[in-house]
């Protein structure tokens, strides 16, 4: 349990560093792009999965 507390402490220090240095705006833009890519892939695989189940039956 202490290990996880230290891991999250280090993550919070890194996030604080990025938040106070102005790098966060660039990282947020990249995160938005990655989010939309992940949503598109999720929907694609969801549709493919539905059609795969229908073709098996």
Swiss-Prot record:
Superkingdom of source: Bacteria
Family from the record: Belongs to the UPF0391 family.
Main location as per UniProt: membrane
Alphabetized UniProt keyword annotations: Cell membrane, Membrane, Transmembrane, Transmembrane helix
GO cellular component term, pick one: plasma membrane
Localization, UniProt: Cell membrane
Membrane-spanning parts: 4-24, 33-53
Organism: Thiobacillus denitrificans (strain ATCC 25259 / T1)
Keyword Repressor on entry: no
UniProt membrane topology term: Multi-pass membrane protein
Name this polypeptide is given: UPF0391 membrane protein Tbd_2239
